[in-house]
Amino acid sequence: MTRVRRGYIARRRRKKMRLFVSSFRGAHSKPIRIVAQQKIRALFSAHRDRDKKKRDFRRLWITRINAAIRETEKGIYYSYSKFIHDLYKRQLILNRKILAQIAILNRNSIYSIYNEILKKEDWKDAPEML
């Protein structure tokens, strides 16, 4: 049986793989077997970490909101979970990202939201929004 020269197609496939891993360190960008393994590993990690990034940012926003809520002038203890529960009761449509940005950039605004929530005792008598 005669030998088949792979030629253009195999070269193109390997070149494409090498371009992907060209910035990898050491032998991770040289031998084609290791290159193939590292490419699979990199794509797997990228896919996993796209979801992880969403979780991490949500945790960060919750931590920032909680820190801002607990730093009140009067020293009244108010937790994040109560704050979010009361926001939903008052039908305030503010997501955690926006609340975290308000907490960092403009503390007075988060205090005013906080005070409005605490002021109204009976939610059914006062359905107006901020």
From Swiss-Prot:
The keyword Plastid applies. Its main location: plastid. GO terms for molecular function: rRNA binding; structural constituent of ribosome. Keywords: Chloroplast, Plastid, Ribonucleoprotein, Ribosomal protein, RNA-binding, rRNA-binding. GO terms for cellular component: chloroplast; ribonucleoprotein complex; ribosome. It is found in: Plastid, Chloroplast. GO terms for biological process: ribosomal large subunit assembly; translation. It holds the Pfam family Ribosomal_L20. The keyword Ribosomal protein applies. Disulfide bonds: none annotated. It comes from the Eukaryota. InterPro entries: Ribosomal_bL20, RIBOSOMAL_L20_CS, Ribosomal_protein_bL20_C. PROSITE patterns: RIBOSOMAL_L20 (PS00937). NCBIfam families: rplT_bact (TIGR01032). Binds directly to 23S ribosomal RNA and is necessary for the in vitro assembly process of the 50S ribosomal subunit. It is not involved in the protein synthesizing functions of that subunit. Belongs to the bacterial ribosomal protein bL20 family. This is Large ribosomal subunit protein bL20c.
